[in-house]
A protein has these predicted regions:
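C-terminal "cap" of GNAT-fold acetyltransferases
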Residues: 5, 125, 132-139, 143-145, ...
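Active-site acidic-Proline motif in GNAT/NAT acetyltransferases
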Residues: 99-105, 133-134
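Conserved hydrophobic beta-strand within the GNAT/NAT acetyltransferase core sheet
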Residues: 93-96, 127-131
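Acyl-donor-binding surface of acyltransferase catalytic domains
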Residues: 1-11
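Conserved GNAT acetyl-CoA-binding A-motif
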Residues: 112, 119-130
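Acetyl-CoA-dependent GNAT
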Residues: 10-14, 20-21, 25-95, 99-101, ...
Length: 175
């Protein structure tokens, strides 16, 4: 059941610092789930983050959506359209994160649905994502949103002396 006062919305430039905090939290909480690591993101100048946010407001080829309750960001997801001419019909969902105390309440599904709506609004034919096979809750969320598996990259991530396989999933929009 979705929490009261939940807002799913596009990121605002004023959210940059809170979003960076949330991203760093995600990388500490679940380092195996992401391609980039905490030290890399924490080591970037703050201007790199504000630039990312400025280009992710949803009006171009990239968007970041957040889950907010009473002014606090508790979840996030990014989506972007491929910049290449031959693949501009496709987009990628990335960086899905919901704070642990809010998991199991449908927030990730709402965030992914926001990406789906954005992709459809941009006229995309497909959205893709990657998820580690060791995360059945995330896989279930994506399947519930209509994504289907099309392959697995063995040993895609190496985190804390362990390999993780990455399941590739796609959602095809019907014309």
């Amino acid at each position: 059941m979705l929490p009261d006062h939940l807002i799913i919305r596009l990121i605002l430039q004023d959210d940059a610092r809170a979003l960076l905090s949330l991203r760093l939290e995600a990388l500490q909480d679940s380092p195996e789930a992401y391609g980039e690591d905490y030290d890399f993101v924490a080591g970037q100048p703050y201007s790199a983050w504000t630039d990312l946010v400025a280009h992710s407001l949803g009006d171009g080829d990239r968007a970041i959506f957040v889950a907010e309750i009473q002014g606090q960001l508790i979840g996030m997801v990014g989506v972007n359209r491929s910049p290449m001419k031959n693949t501009r019909h496709a987009g990628s969902v990335w960086g899905v994160y919901v704070q642990p105390s809010w998991r199991g309440k449908g927030l990730a599904t709402e965030l992914v649905q926001a990406c789906i709506g954005w992709g459809q609004g941009k006229g995309l034919a497909t959205l893709r994502l990657g998820v580690i096979t060791a995360n059945p809750a995330a896989i279930h969320c994506y399947e519930k949103c209509g994504f289907r598996t099309f392959g697995v990259d063995p040993n895609a991530f190496f985190v804390n002396n362990r390999y993780y396989d990455l399941m590739r999933m796609t959602l095809l929009f019907t014309p």
